[in-house]
């Protein structure tokens, strides 16, 4: 086992504090509408430019192991906030640094670290309750756009696009962000349920120009096994032909004579038909077939349920107003499923999302939820250069997460003002002087984001903070973008409560642990062994010239 270096007390805390400061100072320059960019070297390709706090935090690795431990602990604040709220990582880092700095001073002055931490926790709980009480629910598309605009660093076009996407696919719908192939940023919305399986044969195409198969008012047969035997299919095909409606077959696979017969019938014009493979794999495939069945009001034909293909009747088939099938995707629009059944299925999937511990499963469940609940929107981010596109994509991701958080828990005045106001409302009392000191640490620390935003804009923070606090209106604050005071909510300068709350809770949690640290252990660097000596000359080689 390698030898370890152990540092205690003040020496350990000073090293750790230095690491915290290095990471926080690199991150906090990005805060606010006038925050600056950070350039990150990449081992290959162009450097990356970003204003995203967590992206900066993840790149910081320090040479000194003790300093690095402090930096990594603070990085955890940014990462955890990003995982929970998806935005507010810079605010969380600034709060973490402020609490650690104030706490370290108090510990150096001889206060008990555990009591300080208890005081910090008391104050944080009160501030969180105050934020939730003051939260304003957002209802209109304009309010959604405002939140998106602020998080995208004042870019109104992005805010508007996110609001439009949310309006079209609903709050449960999936909105993904991709890099565009062009310089324009655009929004594409796919309504209905789409899955990534295309037609099994190009002969099913109804529109040769676009190479898509469009089926209007179609029946849908859902089968979980392979279809290769034509005899079993005949009763269904005959029943559908009588109705002169098109038929879509979704099965594990359709092959052999079954596929050949379907293609021949389609080409002769006797039967409007198309076949696609079922989406997903294994258990996920069964679940997705069930989803499609509920959406279209049909049944999954499965021998597990004792239903044989030969005995299928028309009322077991799903229905949809329109089905569009391309080479890669199938979209089912306006299925005939009962709303109550779809809602029950959505509730069931939400329950599974809460219970699952696997990130992969959660992602798949959320995809299924979106497909059932409304649709999928894709925001394609464009730019003149690859570096610009990547930087913009970071901002769109943040804006999207902030908007979702705002819809969930509501909004408060932005620009750090909500925390600034909360600092004057803390009434918690500690059981001793050290806990009181912990409460005061939070009072001072939660002013840090507002001060940092104004400092980044080149303003004098103390003057502006003083002026804001002189006014008693909850929403009165300072608009750093244009240097004016006013009602921040009506100006559209807002923060999602979930983002502010999560940032504060995570910052206090990690900062509390850092303050109560008394010893640090790190591996000593290995000493390089001395190089081996040169071997002696070989005998019997005299008389040779070199």
Curated annotation (Swiss-Prot):
Q: Which key words tag this protein in UniProt?
A: ATP-binding, Chaperone, Cytoplasm, Isomerase, Nucleotide-binding
The residues the record assigns to binding ATP are: 30-33, 51, 87-91, 415, 495
The record's subcellular locations are: Cytoplasm
Task: Report the domain of life of the source organism.
Answer: Bacteria
Give the EC number(s) under which this enzyme is classified. Answer: 5.6.1.7
Name the residues that span the membrane. none
- Which SUPFAM superfamilies does the entry mention? GroEL apical domain-like (SSF52029), GroEL equatorial domain-like (SSF48592), GroEL-intermediate domain like (SSF54849)
GO molecular-function term, one example from the UniProt record:
ATP binding
Checking InterPro entries in the record gives: Chaperonin_Cpn60_CS, Cpn60/GroEL, Cpn60/GroEL/TCP-1, GroEL-like_apical_dom_sf, GROEL-like_equatorial_sf, TCP-1-like_intermed_sf
Q: Which leading EC class covers this enzyme?
A: isomerase
Give GO terms for biological process. protein refolding
Entries under CDD domains matching the protein: GroEL
Q: Name one GO cellular component term.
A: cytoplasm
Q: Where is the signal peptide?
A: none
Catalytically driven reaction(s): ATP + H2O + a folded polypeptide = ADP + phosphate + an unfolded polypeptide
Q: Per its UniProt record, what Pfam families does this chain match?
A: Cpn60_TCP1
Q: List the disulfide bonds.
A: none
Name the protein family.
Belongs to the chaperonin (HSP60) family.
Sorted alphabetically, which PANTHER family does this protein's record hold?
A: 60 KDA HEAT SHOCK PROTEIN, MITOCHONDRIAL
Described by its record, this protein's role is as follows:
Together with its co-chaperonin GroES, plays an essential role in assisting protein folding. The GroEL-GroES system forms a nano-cage that allows encapsulation of the non-native substrate proteins and provides a physical environment optimized to promote and accelerate protein folding.
Assembly and oligomerization? Forms a cylinder of 14 subunits composed of two heptameric rings stacked back-to-back. Interacts with the co-chaperonin GroES.
Record's protein name: Chaperonin GroEL
> Which organism does this sequence originate in?
Brucella melitensis biotype 1 (strain ATCC 23456 / CCUG 17765 / NCTC 10094 / 16M)
């Amino acid at each position: 086992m390698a030898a370890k270096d152990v540092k205690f007390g003040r020496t350990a805390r000073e090293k750790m504090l230095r690491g915290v400061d290095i990471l926080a100072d690199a991150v906090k320059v990005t805060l606010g509408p006038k925050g600056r960019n950070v350039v990150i070297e990449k081992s290959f390709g162009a450097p990356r430019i970003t204003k995203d706090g967590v992206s900066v935090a993840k790149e910081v690795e320090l040479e000194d192991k003790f300093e690095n431990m402090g930096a990594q602990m603070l990085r955890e604040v940014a990462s955890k906030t990003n995982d929970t709220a998806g935005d507010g990582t810079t605010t969380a880092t600034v709060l973490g640094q402020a609490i650690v700095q104030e706490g370290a001073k108090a510990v150096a002055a001889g206060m008990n670290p555990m009591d300080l931490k208890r005081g910090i926790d008391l104050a944080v709980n009160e501030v969180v309750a105050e934020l939730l009480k003051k939260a304003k629910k957002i209802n209109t598309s304009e309010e959604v756009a405002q939140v998106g605009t602020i998080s995208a660093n004042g870019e109104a076009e992005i805010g508007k696009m996110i609001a439009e996407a949310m309006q079209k696919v609903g709050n449960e719908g999936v909105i993904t962000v991709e890099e565009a192939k062009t310089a324009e940023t655009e929004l594409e919305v796919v309504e209905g349920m789409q899955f990534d399986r295309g037609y099994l044969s190009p002969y099913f195409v109804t529109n040769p120009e676009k190479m898509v198969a469009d089926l209007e008012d179609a029946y849908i047969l859902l089968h979980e096994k392979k279809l290769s035997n034509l005899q079993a299919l005949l009763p269904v095909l005959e029943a559908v032909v009588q109705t002169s409606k098109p038929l879509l077959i979704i099965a594990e696979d359709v092959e052999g004579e079954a596929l050949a017969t379907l293609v021949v019938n389609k080409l002769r014009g006797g039967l409007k038909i198309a076949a696609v493979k079922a989406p997903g794999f294994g258990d996920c495939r069964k679940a997705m077939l069930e989803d499609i069945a509920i959406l279209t009001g049909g049944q999954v034909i499965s021998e597990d349920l004792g239903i044989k293909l030969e005995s299928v009747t028309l009322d077991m088939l799903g229905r949809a107003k329109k089905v569009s099938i391309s080479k890669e995707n199938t979209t089912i629009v306006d299925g005939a499923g009962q709303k109550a059944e779809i809602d029950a299925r959505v509730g069931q999937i939400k329950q599974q999302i809460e219970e699952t511990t696997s990130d992969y499963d959660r992602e798949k469940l959320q995809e299924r939820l979106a497909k059932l609940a409304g649709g999928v929107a894709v925001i394609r981010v464009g730019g003149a250069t690859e570096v610009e596109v990547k930087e913009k994509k970071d901002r769109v991701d943040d804006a999207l997460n902030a908007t979702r958080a705002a819809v969930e828990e509501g909004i408060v005045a932005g620009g750090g003002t909500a925390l600034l106001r909360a600092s004057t409302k803390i009434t918690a009392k500690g059981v001793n002087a050290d806990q009181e000191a912990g409460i005061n640490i939070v009072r001072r620390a939660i002013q840090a984001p507002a001060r940092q935003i104004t400092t980044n804009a080149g303003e004098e923070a103390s003057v502006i903070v003083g002026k804001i606090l002189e006014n008693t209106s909850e929403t009165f604050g300072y608009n750093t973008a244009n240097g004016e005071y006013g009602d921040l909510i009506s100006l559209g300068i807002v923060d999602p409560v979930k983002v502010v709350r999560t940032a504060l809770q995570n910052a206090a949690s990690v900062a509390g642990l850092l303050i109560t640290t008394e010893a640090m252990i790190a591996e000593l660097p290995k000493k390089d062994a001395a190089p081996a000596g040169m071997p002696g000359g070989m005998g019997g080689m005299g008389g040779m010239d070199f």
